[in-house]
């Protein structure tokens, strides 16, 4: 289950900490938090056993805790503190890039192993990890904190730590997990119906299924079945390669053998304190050394603590997992010696199944229990009475030998190693198909990770063509679409592979909020090329000339109907008006009705601002948000707004007043003077007297301030801030407006008897909501619509600071 503050923007003030019952690990000591942060420095995350206070300070915290600080020491270092003491203080320039843009991070804790990474998806892009020698396995609550500056957080999610990272990535995108009310965490893989997380060697513990050896225990010679390859990979048992081995254990009781086998098959067991010594001796006899060490440590612990002997007390023994998040990923935590297991595979010793690739006349020797350990599909094949259950040979067709060899090596080593050859990408795709076919979930996950790591603008189309047909690769498909959208120009001009995509995929890319282009004309060209399945790159002008000699049906063939579906994704209103006029006179407009209708609609919108009736999507008349820079409000008087950003020459140097630098222009209703100074509004310096005086316009008194962002810039404003000067002329009635030409104004927010301003020098901020926040403007105006609270100067608009926020370009 995921606890999420989805898309909720949270600002944490200096020396404070935000807590929530939702931000809690499911299992104490084990969990992962992922979030976006927006800060100058000191993104601080606290992990405690209980919820802390709002005014939190680690030096005053006497409870056990971990603190991770990203961007400490002026945004240069990473710090980890344990119970108030610094244990990590590292240079981390790759991680510590707190800035005026949201950065994505994740932090996981697993029994004291703290892992920190960048990016949207947990367990990808690991940057740093540290193991606490004395782990605190009880931390459970997550606090979002700050140091001496405000920090903004959003998209905060808490995940369980699991090997199935692909599932977590789906949760990042979907922001929900369907689970039962009891909170049990279950992972059911798409298309299999199998509960993979519950599958493992424990299913074969003391099971006659696939067994090939038997223990005879005690004087009564009780039969206990086992599997040679598992025993020999975990220790050194007296076994032969032939079937029917029997191991006599007359002097051993069943509970002792059961504990040994349970440890081997599941990585954990529980035994009476009085049976520790016999279990140690039996483990030593068969050289299961990790269990020997566990028994000896428990015996020594009881001796040192001088605890009274209790024959009824049970002791838990666990196989240690040193790297839970590493690439080594057996589906069970059993104490396997990987070197031994690989050797057993290479020699074929104890093999009980031969896999014959019919198309290539190749044979692989393997062990049914190992195949079943990784694949529920193989397990069903060998145990449900199918012909393979009774045969020592199975035949497979339509299988790449290189991919099958890689899958077998993965099953025995727990790692995916593929040679970086010319055909690497093709073989990886074949291996992905194979992992999906047999339900080898960890291998499927590793293939997906490799695909993501090597995914580029050049390969995204070929990968999309393949993964769109695999139901379990929806996440990879979505990430490919996103990459295509963000590099649309390149992906549609460097090659014509995109015309081979199916219509649904291409349509999803065109609809994406991440779609980034240098010109809407590029989208028009791409749609026309896709619809004609072009073999060469063409602009709309070339295609228009082709229509002098061919009608639409012969030019677009079977994709002619697709024009009606795809052309509405082109935002014709973003094209220059002169280009629209050329398009209106083109053959495309004359021969294709939907083309003509969309052009007329765009021309009407540009000339009158009206949208034709018919419930047309409003998105067609908006700028693409992805081409704007995000400048979001954090707090009153921050340095995150547009005027500050422009003053840094759009992020390239130290701040200079943008009015003095002539980057923007601020005007007022009264002439510039000592107390009406436009550059004062762009400065953070407090001014005791700063106002725009009244003037007569169209027979009415008017007082206003206007900001001109410049001919080449626009802002979709979603917040604005101003500051009262030293007077008591508090504004009560005013409008905040936007305009493209400085003449026709659109109301973005109307204030009627607003009582917010009540102190001299006060800051105040207001959000712009609904569709108004999606409209881009060059000019912004604050205009009084009624008298202020000061009867002596009721029409002076008295502010000494102004800042705008939103999406800027």
Swiss-Prot record:
The keyword Repeat applies. CDD domains: BTB_POZ_ZBTB_KLHL-like. It holds the Pfam family BTB. It comes from Arabidopsis thaliana (Mouse-ear cress). Keywords: Repeat, Ubl conjugation pathway. May act as a substrate-specific adapter of an E3 ubiquitin-protein ligase complex (CUL3-RBX1-BTB) which mediates the ubiquitination and subsequent proteasomal degradation of target proteins. The BTB/POZ domain mediates the interaction with some component of ubiquitin ligase complexes. The keyword Glycoprotein does not apply. One of its GO terms (biological process) is protein ubiquitination. Residues 211-273, 351-420 form the BTB domain. Pathway: Protein modification; protein ubiquitination. This is BTB/POZ domain-containing protein At2g30600. Residues 466-537 form the BACK domain. It comes from the Eukaryota.
């Amino acid at each position: 289950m995921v606890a999420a503050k989805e898309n909720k923007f949270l600002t944490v003030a200096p020396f404070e900490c935000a807590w929530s019952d939702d931000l809690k690990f499911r299992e104490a000591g084990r969990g992962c938090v992922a979030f976006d942060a927006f800060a100058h420095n000191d993104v601080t995350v606290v992990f405690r056993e209980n919820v802390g206070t709002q005014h939190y300070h680690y030096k005053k915290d006497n409870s056990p805790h971990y603190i991770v600080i990203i961007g400490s020491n002026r945004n240069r270092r990473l710090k980890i503190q344990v119970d108030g003491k610094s244990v990590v203080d590292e240079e981390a320039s790759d991680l510590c890039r707190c800035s005026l843009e949201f950065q994505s991070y994740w932090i996981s804790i697993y029994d004291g192993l703290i892992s920190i990474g960048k990016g949207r998806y947990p367990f990808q892009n690991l940057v740093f990890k540290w193991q606490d020698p004395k782990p605190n396995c009880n931390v459970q609550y997550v606090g979002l904190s700050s140091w001496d500056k405000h920090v903004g957080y959003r998209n905060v999610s808490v995940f369980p730590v699991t090997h199935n990272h692909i599932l977590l990535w789906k949760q990042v995108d979907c922001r929900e997990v369907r689970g039962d009310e009891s909170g049990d965490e279950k992972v059911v893989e798409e298309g299999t119906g199998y509960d993979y997380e519950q599958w493992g060697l424990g299913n074969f513990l003391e099971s006659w299924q696939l067994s090939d050896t038997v223990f005879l225990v005690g004087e009564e010679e009780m039969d206990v079945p086992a599997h040679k390859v598992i025993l020999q990979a975990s220790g050194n048992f007296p076994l032969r390669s032939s079937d029917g081995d029997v191991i006599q254990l007359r002097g051993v009781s069943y509970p002792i053998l059961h504990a040994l086998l349970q440890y081997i098959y599941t990585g954990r067991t529980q035994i009476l304190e009085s049976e520790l010594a016999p279990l140690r001796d039996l483990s030593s006899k068969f050289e299961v050394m990790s269990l020997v060490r566990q028994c000896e440590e428990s015996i020594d612990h009881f001796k040192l603590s001088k605890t009274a002997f209790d024959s009824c007390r049970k002791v838990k023994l666990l196989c240690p997992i040193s790297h839970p998040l590493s690439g080594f990923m057996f589906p069970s935590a059993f104490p396997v010696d990987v070197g031994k297991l690989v050797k057993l595979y290479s020699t074929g010793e104890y093999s009980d199944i031969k896999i014959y690739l019919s198309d290539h006349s190749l044979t692989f020797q393997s062990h049914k229990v190992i195949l079943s350990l990784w694949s529920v599909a193989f397990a069903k094949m060998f145990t449900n009475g199918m012909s393979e259950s009774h045969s020592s040979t199975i035949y497979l067709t339509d299988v790449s030998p290189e991919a099958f060899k890689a899958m077998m090596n993965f099953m025995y080593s727990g790692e995916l190693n593929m040679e970086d050859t010319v055909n690497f990408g093709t073989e990886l795709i074949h291996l992905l198909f194979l992992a999906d076919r047999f339900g080898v979930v960890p291998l499927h996950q590793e293939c997906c990770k490799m695909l993501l790591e090597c995914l580029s603008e050049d390969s995204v189309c070929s990968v999309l063509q393949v993964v769109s047909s695999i139901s379990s690769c929806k996440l990879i498909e979505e990430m490919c679409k996103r990459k295509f959208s963000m590099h649309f120009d390149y992906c549609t001009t460097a090659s014509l592979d995109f015309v081979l995509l199916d219509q649904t995929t291409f349509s999803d890319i065109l609809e994406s909020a991440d779609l980034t282009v240098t010109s809407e004309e590029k989208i028009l060209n791409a749609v026309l090329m896709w619809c004609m399945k072009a073999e060469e790159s063409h602009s709309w002008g070339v295609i228009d000339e082709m229509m002098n000699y061919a009608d639409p049906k012969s030019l677009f063939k079977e994709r002619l109907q697709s024009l009606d579906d795809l052309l509405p994704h082109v935002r014709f209103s973003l094209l220059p008006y002169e280009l629209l006029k050329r398009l209106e006179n083109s053959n495309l407009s004359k021969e294709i009705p939907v083309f003509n209708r969309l052009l007329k609609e765009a021309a009407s919108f540009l000339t009158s601002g009206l949208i034709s009736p018919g419930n047309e999507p409003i998105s067609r008349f908006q700028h693409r948000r992805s081409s704007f820079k995000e400048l979001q409000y954090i707090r009153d008087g921050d340095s995150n707004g547009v005027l500050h950003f422009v003053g840094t020459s759009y992020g390239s140097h130290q701040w200079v007043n943008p009015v003095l630098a002539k980057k923007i222009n601020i005007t007022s209703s009264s002439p510039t003077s000592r107390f009406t100074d436009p550059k004062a509004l762009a400065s953070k310096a407090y001014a005791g007297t700063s106002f725009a005086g009244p003037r007569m316009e169209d027979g009415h008194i008017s007082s206003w301030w206007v900001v001109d962002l410049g001919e080449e810039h626009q802002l979709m404003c979603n917040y604005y801030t101003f500051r009262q000067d030293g007077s008591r002329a508090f504004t009560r009635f005013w409008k905040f407006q936007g305009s493209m030409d400085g003449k026709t104004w659109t109301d973005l927010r109307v204030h009627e008897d607003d009582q917010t301003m009540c102190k001299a020098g006060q800051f105040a901020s207001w959000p712009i909501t609904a569709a108004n926040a999606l409209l881009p403007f060059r000019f912004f105006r604050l205009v009084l619509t009624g008298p202020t609270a000061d009867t002596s100067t009721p029409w002076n608009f008295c502010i000494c600071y102004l800042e705008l926020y939103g999406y800027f370009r």
